[in-house]
Amino acid sequence: FWGSGAQQAQLMKDAEVDMSTGWNGRFDNAKKDGAKVGYTFNQALLDYDCFAMPKGAPNKEVAMRFLAEVSKPQYQANLPFYITYGPTNRKAYEMTKAPKELIESLPSHPKNVPLMLPVSLDWYAKHKNEALELYMELMSE
């Protein structure tokens, strides 16, 4: 197991492991650095990040405007030029100028999403104790 995002790709670059879980962006950077690494989205876990604001936040309106702005497809269409995690606004795929090969390699590309298993936070909320017990058992082996 790895302890940080940087470590997952470094383990592959140094040939310390033959297989690993990890974030596609880290593996893409390792590949750019010359590592012999590849991955597939087949049966991968599709996970999302999010923004949150505390209840009663004093600048809620500004935060909401920020979220509306960064969600616009014209901004997200440029995201693949900087990082390979892919846009979350599907309309960005219709307007991006990124090369087809790059676009089709993104996890959020419409051809890749059906291959993956979405992470269910609802499931983890309902099965927290069971999941923790199984994880601890796995880690102690």
Task: Label each residue range with its predicted role.
Residues 1-4, 45, 54-59, 123, ...:
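Extracytoplasmic/periplasmic, Sec-exported soluble proteins
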Residues 7, 11, 16, 52, ...:
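Extracytoplasmic/secreted proteins, especially bacterial periplasmic and envelope-associated proteins
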Residues 10, 111-141:
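Conserved C-terminal helix/tail region of periplasmic/extracytoplasmic solute-binding proteins
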Residues 40-46:
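Venus flytrap/periplasmic-binding-protein-like
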